[in-house]
Amino acid sequence: MELRGDDVVLRPVADGEGRVLDRIVREPEVAAWWSPPEDFAGMLAIVFEGEVVGAIQFYEETDPEFHHAGIDVFLTARHQGKGLGTDAVRTLARWLVTARGHHRLTIDPAAANTAAIRSYRKVGFRPVGIMRAYGRDHRTGRWQDALLMDLLADELT
């Protein structure tokens, strides 16, 4: 699978790219919001101008009564604020709606992650509510709130 956005390409993480993604997820600006995963299997690499600059993943609820999907994403600090994360989320969201038939998508950034929230709003995600003490900050051990955001298929921009 390879998905092309305006500026990024999303494709399965290739052998050896886990080391690159591990370095990215440990950058202070990324580590503030992401715990390093055990591995990057199942994630899609975000590629910009031939360079892996982050990763995006999705999970699906396939029960026809609740056919929706969720998205998680991280991007290297030096490429944040350039629209690449927005492009990656929009590209994956379009595929989840058109190819996989999902009618609703969710994303749940830390409530304090204002840059991510701004980016997701550009794709069409709307705040639904605060999930209190949703995730533990892996650096401090403190619980932090998350903002649940969702997007219906016809709201995708």
Task: Give a label for each model feature.
Residues 1-38, 154-157:
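A short, well-structured alpha-helix characteristic of acyl/acetyltransferase catalytic modules
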Residues 12, 31-80, 95, 152-156:
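Acetyl-CoA-dependent GNAT
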Residues 82-95, 118-122:
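Conserved acetyl-CoA-binding loop-helix of GNAT-fold acetyltransferases
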Residues 85, 89, 113-116, 132-138:
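Short glycine/proline-centered loop/turn elements that form peptide/ligand docking sites
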Residues 98-108:
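Conserved GNAT acetyl-CoA-binding A-motif
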Residues 106-109, 126-142:
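Conserved catalytic-core motifs of GNAT/GCN5-like acyltransferases
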Residues 120, 125, 149:
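Conserved active-site tyrosine of GNAT-family acetyltransferases
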Residues 140-157:
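Terminal substrate-recognition subdomain of acyl/acetyltransferases
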